Amino acid sequence: MKEVIAYKNDLEDYIYKLRDKINSEKAKGLFNDKEKENLVEEMDKVMQWLYSNDEDLYNIHKLEEKSKNMKKLGDIFLSKLYDWDGIKQYLTKMETLLYEKLAYFASMEEQIKRGEKKDMTIETINKINEYIQKEFNNFEAKMYEIDIADKTKEPKINVNDIENMINIFNDNINKMEKGQK
């Protein structure tokens, strides 16, 4: 009986959290009306069943089946939500990195001009700044793609792609700074 109650509570909790996420600001535009309507309808049916007097409520196998089916539907939604949200977070991380590098190398340029930094040249700083600007243009193009993308479809870029962009960017900056590129 404890297992049945735990399953019921888990399923109910899952549905409440899923409903909150469906109605969140981050979820706007992720699903077309029909998809959202179908998901909400299924959640409502399961919640009604959980509060009914159906004897199957005490059948652990029926509860497992309902839970599995509900989570399968909900996880499709959550996966899409996390994909799009993750992309935005990593693009923001990339943007921050680009601004930080611009500021850092502007500071380095000033140090070179004042004669405080002798291990780097203005030419190197200029090459690095050109590279950063090129990456800024790439970044802005990616942001534009994401902003205009149909959020009801799978993203054309994923978090791993952006993470790789960040790593390659950092590697290239480090090489340029050391005069290797």
Model-predicted segments: where are they?
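PAZ/PAZ-like end-binding module
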Residues: 1-181
